[in-house]
Amino acid sequence: SKYATNCIHKEYLQFKKDLLGDLCTGNINYVEKNGFKGNPIYTLVSHRHPDITYIKNLDIESSLNLLDELGVALWFYDDGSLHKDKLFYNLNTQAYSEEINRDLFAPYLKEKYNIIAKPTIERKKDGREFWYLRISKFEGAYEISELLNKYPVQPYCYKTWSSETSQLWRKLQEELKSTNMENCSNKMKSCILKRLEQSM
């Protein structure tokens, strides 16, 4: 099998191409009109390789077990979005069932990265239902942002917290630890965070 991907950002495909090394020696191609809307896009295709075929044929649980930090970062670059005001992340896993989101994706993120991902339903006007993962600012959003910062991709810098927000978050953690309030409610954490923000 081959690995094929596309993106509106050429820099991101170059990042992936560098990771693929000898598996991908071709050029990044520009397509002037792509899809229904006819928007421009960049594409990248690897060589055929048995390792790609092997990974492609794995079940979801086995694929998750192969993921490292970089793999999770790419997952959020590809399918994640950050709410800039409320500082939570959505991971767009709507292609998968409620059961896969609940029983595979959420436990994996919790056990490996202490990211608490809540399966959330999206109901369409025509009655269709889709599930995705939501990660609140108090339950793993900081960890996601820090993970993305380990593997920076300039066009996607908007998917990470600002340095000021990260600094404020670290101050919150220090205060919670010093006052033995690490297990307090998210509402209480929000109040403390607001106070710290006002004092800066």
Q: Over which residues does each language-model region extend?
A:
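Internal intein/HINT superfamily modules and their associated LAGLIDADG
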Residues: S1-M200
